[in-house]
Regions:
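N-terminal/edge-of-domain interface segments
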Residues: 1-222
Length: 222
């Protein structure tokens, strides 16, 4: 299940807490139910879980952190598995390198395997860019940078789910929550453009010349 906390007290101490970057963590995430397009994600509380609130896999850049995770599921059925997640230290999105592999084990003994690629199924949590199966649905300023989480959906076979397994590949992979449910269209948040300053246009030295308007329109010959 969950293997670390949203908050990190000390950067690079190899003890984890999100991506082990100190204050550049996800402690701003409020515990409780976060609804995304009607999809409920249960955000756990670090204070109540003993610091085991989310799943973070270190990848090559945090090789000392856990690289695999197993999340038991109590034989729940759902048409889709939804992840609320992000990645860190991603290769360029256009390369679509594999952030990790997602396995869904069913009660009947079968398994589904999904290759989760940055630039398609997940995105860099420090950037606002969304992709085909990585919809930007949450963002906040964590006193270091503006960070985001993305919702992704993976179509399941149909039998009850026994467990979800995750393995890191080319980048760190952070899963804040996951849920099973019916097919739902995920709506993302839009980028907001803000101006740092406002400017007043300089006064004109002289009025602009008036445009002479002709009463008869002229055809344009192409």
């Amino acid at each position: 299940g969950a293997n670390t906390a949203f908050a990190d007290r000390q950067a690079d101490d190899r003890q984890g807490g999100w991506t082990d970057q100190g204050g550049n963590d996800l402690s701003v995430m409020k515990p409780g139910t976060l609804k995304v397009s009607g999809i409920p994600f249960a955000i756990l509380n670090d204070a109540e879980t003993g610091g085991k609130s989310c799943v973070v896999l270190g990848g090559p850049q945090r090789s000392y952190l856990t690289q695999t995770a197993n999340v038991p599921v109590d034989n729940v059925q759902g048409a889709y598995l939804y992840l609320l997640h992000g990645a860190a230290w991603c290769p360029p999105a256009k390369e679509q390198k594999m952030t990790g592999v997602l396995f869904v084990d069913y009660a009947d003994g079968s398994t589904s395997e999904f290759h989760v690629r940055c630039g398609r199924d997940v995105a860099d949590w420090a950037k606002p860019d969304a992709y085909k199966n990585a919809v930007r649905v949450w963002t906040a300023y964590n006193n270091n940078t503006q960070v985001s989480l993305f919702a992704s959906k993976f179509k399941l076979k149909g039998p009850a789910v026994k467990a979800v397994r995750l393995e890191a590949r080319d980048s760190a992979w952070m899963v804040a929550a996951m849920t099973l449910g019916d097919d739902t269209r995920i709506s993302g948040i839009k980028k907001q453009v803000t101006l740092d300053k406002t400017y007043t246009a300089p006064a004109l030295a002289a009025p602009l010349p008036a445009v002479q308007v002709q009463s008869v329109p002229k055809n344009i010959i192409l």
